[in-house]
Amino acid sequence: MLKESLDKFIAPVYGKTKRTPNTYQTVSHHCTRNITRLVDEYRSVKNDQQLLREIRNDIDYYLRRYHEYCIKQRDGMSAHYHEIGADAKTDFEHLIPAARIRDLLLSEAITVEQALNVPTVKLSRAKHALLKEAGWASTTPDMWYPFRRYTQVFGASFETHDGKTIDPETWTLEEHYAYFEHLIIG
C-alpha cells in the first residue's frame, strides 16, 4: 500500500508570492495568532518541563519568523537601526536578546506586538564578535537603554533605517516603540 501511494504521488507546485503590504500583513497576523495561542498554552501547563520547553521553542520560531520576514527582509529596512560606518559584512542582531524577549512576553512585561517589534540592528561582524567575547551574546545589562549592551563593550554610532542618528547612551526602549510605531504591521 505504501509503495502504491508513493508511486501515485505527484509533487505539488507551490506558487511564489511577491512581497506586498498584504503579504507582510498575512505573516504578521499568522505570527501574532500563533504566539498568542502558544502563550496561552504555556500559562496552562502544569508540571511538564519538556512541554514548556517545546512551547518556548515554538514561540521563538514565530518571533524569529516575523523578525526575518517583516523586518530584516522588508523593503528599505533590513533592521530598525544600522551601525554607522559598518562594512558590508553585518549581522542582523536583536538589541535585547531573543530569548529575553520571549521571557518578557511570557511574564507579561511586554505585549505580543512589542515582542514582534523589538529593536534590531545591522551590526558589523567584528563588533558582534566583540559582543560575544565580552559575554553579552545572550544577555543585556539594561533593557530600558538597549544600546548599553554595546556601549559597554565598544564605541559605535547608530542611525535608524531611515537615517536619524540616535544617541546609544540615552535612547530608550520607549523611544524605540514611539519612533517605529508607524511601521507596525496591523
Where are these regions (language model features)?
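Amphipathic alpha-helical interaction surfaces
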Residues: 69, 98-101, 126-130
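Nuclease and nuclease-like effector domains acting on nucleic acids or nucleotide cofactors
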Residues: 1-87, 134-186
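Short Cys/His-centered divalent metal-binding micro-motifs
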Residues: 114-140
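Residues that flank catalytic or metal-binding motifs in active/ligand-binding sites
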Residues: 91, 119-120, 146
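Histidine-centered nuclease catalytic patch
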Residues: 84-115
